[in-house]
């Protein structure tokens, strides 16, 4: 799915760079996490969250690095639901802020 997202978003990445970016996050890296969206046997997407520190917010913050939903299930509110539930899912991590950047050219309305 990461390859599909990068292709769609015009991100020039290789298998090696994708593996180097994903593998630590799948193995309990303190720098971030990857969560599958949907059932583990047949996920319909994923979200990558990375962690940092914010002087402005006075503590740890998170950044939505990637959010991907398979084309066949888009337009059903899946991404909206994930983003709405994200603060609840990360509440125990002590986050002070969650940041999201949007590439408007990728929005399919």
Label each residue range with its predicted role.
Residues 80:
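Residues forming the Rossmann-fold NAD(P)(H) cofactor-binding site
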Residues 74, 88-93:
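Peripheral/terminal regions associated with large enzymatic or DNA-binding modules
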Residues 63-64, 99:
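Generic enzyme active-site microenvironment
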Residues 91-102:
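Conserved GNAT acetyl-CoA-binding A-motif
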Residues 107-109:
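Conserved small/polar residues in nucleotide/adenosyl-binding loops
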Residues 1-59, 65, 70, 83-85, ...:
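Acetyl-CoA-dependent GNAT
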Residues 70-72, 76, 104-105:
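Active-site acidic-Proline motif in GNAT/NAT acetyltransferases
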């Amino acid at each position: 799915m990461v390859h599909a997202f990068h292709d769609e978003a015009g991100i020039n990445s290789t298998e090696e760079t994708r593996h180097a970016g994903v593998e630590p996050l799948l193995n309990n890296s303190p720098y971030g996490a990857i969560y599958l969206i949907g059932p583990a046997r047949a996920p319909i997407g994923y979200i990558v969250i990375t962690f940092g520190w914010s002087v402005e917010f006075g503590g740890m913050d998170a950044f939505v690095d990637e959010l991907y939903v398979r084309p066949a299930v888009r337009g059903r509110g899946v991404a909206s639901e994930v983003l709405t539930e994200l603060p609840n899912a990360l509440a125990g991590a002590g986050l002070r802020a969650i940041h999201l950047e949007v590439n408007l050219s990728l929005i399919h309305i």
